[in-house]
A protein has these predicted regions:
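Domain-length accessory/inserted modules outside core catalytic folds
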Residues: 1-102
Length: 102
């Protein structure tokens, strides 16, 4: 599935990964936590990122908080993760760069 991946201090980039929990856990460095950030976009992050003191990644104005550690954004198909649509990827990428807020 096509995702958007962002590590702290780096620009977001598009990746293609298998739709597997283990792969997502490897990318975020631990157990995952999800947060809906748009109609079809779901942010996947490390569940214990703040407790572990992971590096700040970007400020997310819609929740008034800073997201820490490496993150990925996936789309959804019903109850399953899926490829992130291109239009959503472009908008979310801009947010992660600090361009505007949802």
């Amino acid at each position: 599935m096509r995702i958007l991946y962002k590590q702290p201090g780096q620009d977001p980039r598009s990746l293609v990964i298998p739709n597997e929990l283990k792969v997502m856990q490897q990318l975020v460095g631990g157990r995952i936590e999800t947060l809906r950030i748009s109609d079809n976009g779901i942010l996947v992050m490390n569940e214990e990122g703040k407790l572990l003191g992971l590096e700040e990644n970007f400020y997310f104005g819609a929740i008034g908080d800073t997201i820490v550690g490496p993150v990925l954004v996936v789309g959804e198909d019903g109850e399953d993760f899926a490829s992130l649509p291109d239009d959503e990827a472009a908008e979310i990428s801009q947010i992660m760069r600090g361009g505007f807020e949802i």
